[in-house]
């Protein structure tokens, strides 16, 4: 089985991947450097690939996206009919929640405005701030 990995993977990550599927062939590349031959030979693709390249697939069994979104891969004929498409829905929920919470706090404390004033070397009061 040929497993095409488009995710950035250091030596530790590669060892983990390869130990999970001993004896399988792993090919590491990036979305920018991928070739049609690599796609044609892949049984499994881990990572996001240009959907147009999927027409080169000859025996793809699984496409595991690294993102939650998958709309670009839903067009008819994009992913071979007998292949499974998997994405990372739910993997980023906590990080997105924390980011939104940080942005709300930033806005109620007027941090963007104070940041702009600081860059301009102006020390002014932007008015009252609210509290949670």
Where are these regions (language model features)?
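N-terminal glycine-/charge-rich "phosphate-binding" loop or analogous flexible N-terminal tail
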Residues: 1-44
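Active-site-proximal loop/helix segment associated with metal-binding centers of metalloenzymes
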Residues: 126
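Phosphate/diphosphate ligand-binding glycine-rich loop within oxidoreductases
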Residues: 41-120, 129-130
